[in-house]
Amino acid sequence: MICDAEELSALDRKLSGVYRAATKKATNQHPPVLKAEQRGWIKRRNECRKSGDKRNCLSGAYLRRIAELQARYRLVPGKGPFRYRCDGNLANEVVATFFQTDPPRLIAERGDSVSLMYLQPSGSGTKYQGRNESFWEHHGEALITWGYGAAPLHCKKAQ
């Protein structure tokens, strides 16, 4: 199906180039995380054959993977990093870098953990969602949830 649809073929070629660029930046990873993640992504992409809308499923899978690699390996310019101090505690900080990928991405860091988030529709402000983390910014303040079932942190952008 990918070879038969020009849009999907173009996304496949773009991902190939982005993946090559990421491998150049990931040369010192031990174990080689990028290669293992790519194999996992291919398995998930192949699950689109079970989808009722295969083309849309495949297109979304490619766009998300391209955006993930571009942000994670800093293949596109980022805006930031911006520091957010949470709950009035100087030691409780989240560092956010925004990437104008398609879809837009945010990499947030808190302590030793990192979350890769996607832009989500929001009635007001800017909202990103990761696996178990969320970041919702409005007028220089952010409501950040870090971890499954965790209470939200009330954060302000540091000057």
Give short role names for the model-derived ranges.
Residues 1-159:
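N-terminal alpha-helical modules
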